[in-house]
Amino acid sequence: MNYYNVGKIIATHGLKGEVKVALTTDFPEDRFRAGSRLYLGDDSREVTVAAGRPFKQFWLVTFAEITDIDQAEKLKGTEILISEEDQGELPDGVYYYRELLGCKVLDDESGEEIGELTDIEAPGANDIWEVTDKNGKSFWLPYIPQVVKSVDIDKKEVRVELMEGLR
């Protein structure tokens, strides 16, 4: 079974086993909803979310199996994982980062290969995609309809229209 990272435990919060989680998921409301099944660390120990709530740029999460600060303290630095089968389907036009990374980026008009999608960041309203060309030079593209014209996950191709000054 494949597992994917959804966050990392960075600290404890309170005395009853609640932990502070730095997110690596775009869907914290789903991932940290009461009753959700997640896995901890390399040994993929299964845990059940008892409660989850936003807290500043983090989430505070309580697992049913972790009931005090001593147990929670041992989890600092632990990755939180979700199994592939628990991820669920995404709506059309929404993709997991792992599906996009490594895609060839093509000019929509000419079909010419511009580079490869090598990184994705989410600094604000829109994601930005790092594209690295064959010479190793990279530049960023905003993930907006005016730039990204189509995504074909099966072919691992993204077609874009480069606006003036993006490259």
From Swiss-Prot:
Keyword tags: Chaperone, Cytoplasm, Ribosome biogenesis, rRNA processing
Major localization listed first in the record, in broad terms: cytoplasm
GO CC field: cytoplasm; ribosome
Annotated localization: Cytoplasm
Record GO biological process: ribosomal small subunit biogenesis; rRNA processing
GO MF terms held by the record: ribosome binding
InterPro entries in the record: PRC_barrel-like_sf (IPR011033), PRC_RimM (IPR056792), RimM (IPR011961), RimM_N (IPR002676), RimM_N_sf (IPR036976), Transl_B-barrel_sf (IPR009000)
Domain PRC barrel per the UniProt entry, residue ranges: 92-166
Top-level taxon of the source organism: Bacteria
Family: Belongs to the RimM family.
Domain notes: The PRC barrel domain binds ribosomal protein uS19.
PANTHER family in alphabetical order: RIBOSOME MATURATION FACTOR RIMM
Subunit structure as annotated in this protein's UniProt entry: Binds ribosomal protein uS19.
Known function: An accessory protein needed during the final step in the assembly of 30S ribosomal subunit, possibly for assembly of the head region. Essential for efficient processing of 16S rRNA. May be needed both before and after RbfA during the maturation of 16S rRNA. It has affinity for free ribosomal 30S subunits but not for 70S ribosomes.
Protein name listed in UniProt: Ribosome maturation factor RimM
Organism: Lactobacillus delbrueckii subsp. bulgaricus (strain ATCC 11842 / DSM 20081 / BCRC 10696 / JCM 1002 / NBRC 13953 / NCIMB 11778 / NCTC 12712 / WDCM 00102 / Lb 14)
Organism lineage string: Bacteria, Bacillati, Bacillota, Bacilli, Lactobacillales
